[in-house]
Amino acid sequence: MSRYDLVERLNGTFRQIEQHLAALTDNLQQHSLLIARVFSLPQVTKEAEHAPLDTIEVTQHLGKEAEALALRHYRHLFIQQQSENRSSKAAVRLPGVLCYQVDNATQLDLENQIQRINQLKTTFEQMVTVESGLPSAARFEWVHRHLPGLITLNAYRTLTLINNPATIRFGWANKHIIKNLSRDEVLSQLKKSLASPRSVPPWTREQWQFKLEREYQDIAALPQQARLKIKRPVKVQPIARIWYKGQQKQVQHACPTPIIALINTDNGAGVPDIGGLENYDADNIQHRFKPQAQPLRLIIPRLHLYVAD
């Protein structure tokens, strides 16, 4: 497929996402809102976009106010829709839930509508990350040449739909991106970097090359069977824990955007019990279960690369 055809498909798919999101928000407003609870988080400024989040103060919104915030959030796709001071790199998150009363027919209609939106979002992400054939650093420029100001993460984010929950509880999750690597895989990556000399502020080209050579030597000195692990921290994430009484099971969802809960009164479902979201405080985290961590030694800090001792 030619680059021109891909751009045409990219623009066409994005227009469909916008149209279907507009139709969904109109459709939801035609349904009876049983309960709504969302939690706005402080905006991240451009100056603080890389700073660690040690505390997060939560503001609760209820009812129609919560619904209005949520429906606007679903369609928040461009930086032009937000404050000039707000970071365009930090994700805009609005955890919470909207609960709507449905019958069998309207439940199926909304399920199909949301499934279609999620399919389009997945297709759009595939075009950008795979079909474009571009490295991650070049994708930003390519996408924004055709869709100026697009917040790609918001375009990729799918909507979470649940049916007839009994209880919904919110909380925070601290996670790491973990990837296991062999010594030879890391050496191969470093070789590629060494073969393409460049400067990386605050280092000059020569200083960066020397730094890479030292890293290569450190990895090469390890036994071939050494167990290496990238363990990169991810900023704390809001989550929702959903309890289904009939199935007697709990399901956990990431909750960067309000969940849509359909309550089917034809089947006798009732309004769920919805909890709040506490302020986040990194110094006061209580772990339900924290397994014994494997002893790791940091070997390349910039890559968050560790070796198992």
From Swiss-Prot:
Keywords, ordered alphabetically: Cytoplasm, DNA replication, DNA-binding
UniProt KW Cytoplasm keyword: yes
The organism sits in which domain of life? Bacteria
Fetch the Pfam families from UniProt. Ter
Q: Which NCBIfam families match?
A: rep_term_tus (TIGR02648)
Annotated GO molecular function terms are:
DNA binding
Task: Output this protein's name.
Answer: DNA replication terminus site-binding protein
Q: Which Gene3D superfamilies match?
A: 3.30.54.10, Replication terminator Tus, domain 1 superfamily/Replication terminator Tus
Question: What biological process terms from GO does the record include?
Answer: DNA replication termination
